[in-house]
Amino acid sequence: MSEEIISFTNPALGPLPTKAPQLPSNVLDLFSLKGKVASVTGSSGGIGWAVAEAFAQAGADVAIWYNSKPADAKAEYLTEKYGVKAKAYKCNVTDPNDVSKVINEIEKDFGTIDIFVANAGVAWTDGPEIDVQGYDQWKKIVDCDLNGVYYCAHTVGQIFKKNKSGSLIITSSMSGTIVNIPQLQAPYNAAKAACTHLAKSLSVEWASFGARVNSISPGYILTDIADFADPEMKKKWWQLTPLGREGLPQELVGAYLYLASNASTYTTGSNIAVDGGYTCP
């Protein structure tokens, strides 16, 4: 009898090679989310809403998360427009107890969670950190942009482990790779760099129970989170971006759909940059 081959990174996988999934032969079917349940934080507007609607268009039932902007009407819209089940949930992602409660509610209401997008985030708009008094603003960024992601991942990961499958997608940022100019935002950059590496780290840990973890790093996108930028700052953004403009939220959804669907069953630990080429030069 030949000796068993065991993984160096995940011995819990058992004897190698692992079994490949059975996939549809039609490429369009690979991108279908029919029969899946998706949960998207920060989805009352901006990137999160674009992703939630795209998932509904692909056939998924969708749980929308909001904090300050009620999204019940948007959930109703998804149901009426695309014939999927949709419901809005209010949650403060900086509160781990609230996160756990909402994720458990979603599992109860929908039966499970197959896809989770940790997207909620806030921007740093206070300039050079050395000029900021105290640590409240730092804590605000880290609590939402990093801790909130971890709280969501830690809780939904339990569901994925139970199901032996699942896809976690973390919205990171090109700011986790580069240092932004002309605006200075060290706390945001640090939080997003941590998000990118958290995704990579979890991808190795969660592979043992069949779940995948990836991140997406948008560049400058036309959403409310960028409203702090004045026209002169945006001109500099355009000059620094090879495509010469900001992106639309709809230009991101293809990457999210890929990572959510069976088109990406061999993709884990990846960070997809959708930044108009900003990080290339």
From Swiss-Prot:
- The EC number of this protein is 1.1.1.289
Q: Which reaction does it catalyse?
A: D-sorbitol + NADP(+) = keto-L-sorbose + NADPH + H(+)
pH dependence of activity: Optimum pH is 6.2.
Q: Mention one GO biological process in which this protein takes part, according to its record.
A: L-sorbose catabolic process
EC top class, in one word? oxidoreductase
Record: active site: S173, Y188, K192
Q: Which UniProt keywords apply?
A: Carbohydrate metabolism, NADP, Oxidoreductase
One family name in Pfam for this protein = adh_short_C2
Protein name, entry field: Sorbose reductase SOU1
**What are the top taxonomic ranks of the organism?**
Eukaryota, Fungi, Dikarya, Ascomycota, Saccharomycotina
